């Protein structure tokens, strides 16, 4: 069926092949108990685990652990140029081997494919949405979402000539390089931002033109802390896909902002029920359930919004602090250390208003200094945001290129 569908839109001079007919596919194996086979010897065999690869990795170049040679017969040996697939975690994600080693039963290996496939082209073909859709279709009706040799063997792939495969893989590799380099730059900018924030919100570095001792304040005494109270709790049926007002929950927090596209909605009556939790631009939000202590500063609200029960609205009621400055304090180690002291080494699943009564901190003595600090950090956030937008654009371009190049809608030769 998939073969017939593919034939309707790929070029006439391409083939459509079933992977298992042109490659050898095997499942890994695990010597047990594994601890008895691990070794630190240089003579050990690389023991490949999902933890040995990062999010952007295409190649497996090293491993944290090795097994003794006697374990090879109870496992599966893989070699340079082989492709391995995770059959459960990172479902179906391919990697190219740059080393030799052994794989456990959480991996599948694809070998002896080079009669018809270029290595890098096969990597991208297996990474494509076309392949992922086939995996999903094969798993339909099953509660266990994992791969096996039989499923991967049935995967159908478009197959141009080797020279065209190499050209396609080269173009996709170039866009991958751009994406990886941009991710590295974003991580670097975030690290710099984190370090700058830490020294500015603690007063370890003062900005030019400001002096005077910082002032000790208590967050609760200088704030209005509000959340949805128990009797106002929402039922699942009240979580709407469209409605009058955004409903902000703890899962909507992302990188100091609210992911509006992921929010549910509530009707007008639920929004109007409690003005204390109606959200406006300039508000500071703090999660108090689940992953506690996540914080968001609201600056891009485009319609009414209200809170679910797991979120505090924190609003200044004195001139002791600005909400934007406090946002950065709550993002810093100052607040993280406070939460650690609250937990006393154990996990806390709820942040109470009475807990925040205990939170004392030092702030600049003037609003002007707080705003100057905020301005520097906001500019850094804006730069990171623009880079992340650029990254998202590159990722969308890559997906479009994969769709067009791997099906022959766009030809390179």
Question: What feature does the model see in each segment?
Answer:
Residues 2-3, 12, 87, 102-108, ...:
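A short glycine-rich beta-alpha junction/loop motif
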Residues 90-93, 290-294:
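Short, charged beta-turn/beta-strand-edge "cap" motif at the junction between a beta-strand
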């Amino acid at each position: 069926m998939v073969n017939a569908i593919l034939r309707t839109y790929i070029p006439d001079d391409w083939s459509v092949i079933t992977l298992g007919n042109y490659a050898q596919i095997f499942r890994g194996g695990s010597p047990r108990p594994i601890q008895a086979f691990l070794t630190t010897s240089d003579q050990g065999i690389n023991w490949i685990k999902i933890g040995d690869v990062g999010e952007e990795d295409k190649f497996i170049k090293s491993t944290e652990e090795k097994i003794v040679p006697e374990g090879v017969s109870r496992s599966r040996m893989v070699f340079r140029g082989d492709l391995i697939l995770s059959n459960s975690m990172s479902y179906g994600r391919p990697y190219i081997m740059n080393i030799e080693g052994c794989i456990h039963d959480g991996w599948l290996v694809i070998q002896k494919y080079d009669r018809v496939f270029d290595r890098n082209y096969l990597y991208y073909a297996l990474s494509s949405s076309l392949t992922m859709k086939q995996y999903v279709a094969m798993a339909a009706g099953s509660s266990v979402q994992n791969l096996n040799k039989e499923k991967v063997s049935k995967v159908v792939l478009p197959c141009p000539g080797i020279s065209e495969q190499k050209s396609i893989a080269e173009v996709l590799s170039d866009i991958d390089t751009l994406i990886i380099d941009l991710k590295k730059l974003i991580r670097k900018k975030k690290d710099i931002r984190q370090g700058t924030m830490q020294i500015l919100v603690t007063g370890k570095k003062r900005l030019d033109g400001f002096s005077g001792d910082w002032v000790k304040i208590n967050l609760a005494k200088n704030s209005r802390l509000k959340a949805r109270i128990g009797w106002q709790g929402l039922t699942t049926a009240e979580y709407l896909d469209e409605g009058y007002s955004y409903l902000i929950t703890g899962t909507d927090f992302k990188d100091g902002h609210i992911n509006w596209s992921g929010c549910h909605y509530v009707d007008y009556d639920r929004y109007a029920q409690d003005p204390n939790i109606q959200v406006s631009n300039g508000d500071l939000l703090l999660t108090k359930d689940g992953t506690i202590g996540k914080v968001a500063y609201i600056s891009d609200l485009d319609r009414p919004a209200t809170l679910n029960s797991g979120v505090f609205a924190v609003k200044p009621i004195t001139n002791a602090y600005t909400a934007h400055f406090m946002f950065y304090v709550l993002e810093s180690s100052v607040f993280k250390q406070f939460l650690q002291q609250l937990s006393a080494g154990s996990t806390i699943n709820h942040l109470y208003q009475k807990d925040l009564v205990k939170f004392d901190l030092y702030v600049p003595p003037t609003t002007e200094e707080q705003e100057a600090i905020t301005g520097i950090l906001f500019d850094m956030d804006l730069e990171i945001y623009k880079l992340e937008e650029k990254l998202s654009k590159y990722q969308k371009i890559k997906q479009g290129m994969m769709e067009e190049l791997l099906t022959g809608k766009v030809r390179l030769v």
